[in-house]
């Protein structure tokens, strides 16, 4: 995913927050798209800080072992990306007779890519829930609500 910070930082932030909140160890982070589909990439470090969390204190470092174990690695040692992680999870759910709820926050680039690349897997999705995107001016300010 991209948005208020780079895809790398937002993935690291997700892993750090899961660790801080004591989430079960079998909840993983799959880094998403590194750029928007159409417009140029834009981050706002003056609003959200370089890492996208704006100076939040008390989280483990991004390279802490407990954060790094939140990433599933492929055979080359690179993190498995969101599209592949979503596809695998949804295929398992379908095989077990279940459906998933996809929750997305921020830009919906990964959802758009998933729907385009894996239309056959939409049958395994019960609903999409999202907080993100904007029409017109968007939410690019320190006081956007």
Regions found by a protein language model. Give the residues of each.
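A conserved beta-strand->alpha-helix junction
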Residues: 31-35
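Histidine-centered metal-binding segments
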Residues: 45-46
């Amino acid at each position: 995913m991209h948005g208020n910070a780079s895809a790398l930082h937002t993935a690291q932030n997700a892993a750090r927050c899961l660790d801080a909140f004591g989430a079960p160890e079998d909840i993983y982070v799959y880094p998403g798209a590194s750029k928007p589909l159409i417009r140029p990439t834009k981050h706002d470090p003056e609003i959200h800080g370089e890492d996208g969390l704006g100076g939040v204190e008390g989280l483990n470092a991004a390279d802490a072992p407990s954060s790094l174990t939140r990433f599933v690695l492929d055979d080359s040692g690179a993190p498995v990306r969101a599209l592949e992680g979503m596809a695998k999870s949804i295929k398992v759910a379908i095989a077990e007779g279940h459906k998933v709820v996809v929750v997305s926050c921020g830009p919906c680039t990964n959802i758009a890519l998933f729907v385009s690349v894996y239309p056959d897997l939409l049958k395994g999705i019960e609903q999409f829930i999202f907080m993100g995107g904007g029409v017109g001016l968007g939410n690019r300010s320190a006081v956007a609500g």
